[in-house]
Regions:
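Structured binding/interaction patches within domain cores
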Residues: 1-192
Length: 192
C-alpha cells in the first residue's frame, strides 16, 4: 500500500493488514474470548503499537457511542481511557471487565427485555445518515438494531480489554463494521 492509497483508503481492515505486515505481526483475526486479566503490575501496554491500537479501539467506541447505551459499558470505556493515561491501576480495568462483559451477555441473552426494547427503539430512531457515519461504508443495508446493539456491546468489551488479549490480531469479523479508516488515520500514520 502506498501513502496515497493509505490516504484514500476507506477500509480500516486493509489498512490494519498493511500495518501488521509492515510490523511483521500476524494479522489473523483474533477470537474474542472472555476472562482476560491484566497483570497487577502492568500500567501500560507492551508497545507503542499496542497503545495506539487500544486508543483506536476506544475511539471507535466513542464514535459508536449511541450504540452503547448500557451504563456499565460506558463506564468501562472511560476506565480504559483513564488506564491508558496512567490514572487508574490495572485492577480497575480488570474490575470493570466483569460488568462490561455482563452488559454484553445481558443484551445477547435478552435478560432485561423492557430495557433492551427501549435501546432497540433508540437505535431504530437514529437517522440513516447518522448510522451510516458510524458504520463501515461496505454496509449498504441498515443492519438489524438488535444485532447491531449486541455486536457493539461485544466490540466495546473487546476494545476495553484489548491490552490483556494474547495473541493480538485483527478484530473478529463481526466487529469490522465499526472500524473507521478516517479514525485509524487519526491514530496511526502511514509507514512504509
Amino acid at each position: 500500500m502506498t501513502e496515497s492509497e493509505w490516504d484514500d483508503c476507506e477500509d480500516a481492515i486493509s489498512m490494519l493488514e498493511f500495518v501488521f505486515d509492515q510490523l511483521e505481526i500476524r494479522s489473523d483475526s483474533t477470537q474474542h474470548k472472555f476472562g482476560y486479566r491484566l497483570n497487577s503490575g502492568s500500567v501500560a501496554p507492551d508497545s507503542q503499537f499496542e497503545t495506539t491500537m487500544h486508543r483506536f479501539h476506544l475511539a471507535v467506541c466513542r464514535k459508536i457511542w449511541p450504540l452503547l447505551p448500557d451504563d456499565e459499558t460506558q463506564k468501562g470505556v472511560a476506565v480504559a481511557e483513564k488506564w491508558l493515561d496512567g490514572d487508574v491501576p490495572s485492577s480497575a480495568l480488570n474490575d470493570c471487565d466483569y460488568y462490561v462483559e455482563g452488559a454484553a451477555f445481558g443484551i445477547d441473552y435478552k435478560s432485561s427485555p423492557d430495557e433492551l426494547n427501549r435501546w432497540i427503539s433508540t437505535i431504530d430512531a437514529i437517522p440513516e445518515s447518522e448510522l451510516r457515519a458510524m458504520l463501515h461504508p461496505q454496509f449498504t443495508e441498515r443492519p438489524d438494531s438488535y444485532e447491531l446493539l449486541k455486536s457493539a456491546a461485544y466490540f466495546a468489551h473487546y476494545a476495553i480489554m484489548y491490552p490483556a488479549m494474547n495473541p493480538k490480531g485483527l478484530p473478529p469479523d463481526s466487529y469490522h463494521q465499526f472500524l473507521s479508516a478516517d479514525l485509524l488515520r487519526v491514530h496511526m500514520r502511514y509507514a512504509a
